[in-house]
Amino acid sequence: MLCLSGEGTRTYIQSGEAFYINGSDADSKNGLMTDNTNYLNSTKVINRFISKLSDLQDYSKAEMHKNHEAATLQLKSYTWNFDIVPCFYTDTGFYLIPDGSGNWKKTDPRIDNEHITDINQKHNGKLLELIRLAKYWNNRKVTIRIGSYLLECMILQKYENKEASENWWIDLEFRDLLNYLSSAILSDVDDPKGIQGNLNSFCWDDRCKISDALTNAYNKAVEASNMELNDKNQKGAITKWGE
């Protein structure tokens, strides 16, 4: 999240779950307002970021995220992506971020940070490495990319309800995680903050495609772990993991 300064002058109104931020003369001159209104359009703000970031040499691509709530950046020097989410911090203690429809919605990343810290500590500080591995797999484009936050929440959902184990092998944890995710992606995923509701905005067909890819990856992971543990074929296991 990248906080924008309101300089103490911006105001907003709420209608249901949607928030509308009143724009300024500068916003109007920069074409950042929703047509025929005085409200700052979150989609246009993201596009403004994209147009500026595209000029930087360190980035290979900057584009709108599928959910229209962030700018996705691809770096030249790394294989993973970064999502940039513009936000405003309010005087009542929460943040406003794009809602995907041009308006704004309420969130609070501090709750997320506390949530992931607690669960990671429960599992002896080993969970973050597993999350990074899952995100690396997700970015290999073997299927429709799962949003980083959605993926993280599904993983936390699994490990929040799992007892900590002293016998932690990241390859076996990742194997079993793939199996869990293949089922979890088919269902709605509640926002752990209790703010955004269901985080899984994929249609049923896309959910099934992602689930099939996760199942396929799980089956390969089972083969790889069997090669290593039962057949003592470490080289073959490494090759299978690479698939």
What are these regions, as identified by a protein language model?
Residues L2-E7, K29-N30:
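Short loop/turn segments at strand-loop or loop-helix junctions that form parts
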Residues S5-E7, I50, S165:
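Acidic, low-complexity intrinsically disordered regions
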Residues K126-D231, K240:
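Conserved nucleotidyltransferase catalytic core and NTase-mimicking acidic/glycine-rich helix/loop elements
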Residues G8-T11, M33:
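Intrinsically disordered, low-complexity Ser/Thr/Pro/Gly-rich regulatory segments
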Residues L40-K44, N124-G125, Y149:
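Soluble non-cytosolic domains of exported or imported proteins
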Residues Q74, T79-K126, L130-R132, G197-S211, ...:
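Extended, alpha-helix-rich binding/interface surfaces that flank or overlap catalytic cores
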Residues G6-T9, Y89-T90:
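Short, charged/polar surface micro-motifs in flexible loops or helix N-caps
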Residues S15-F94:
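Conserved catalytic core of two-metal-ion nucleotidyltransferases
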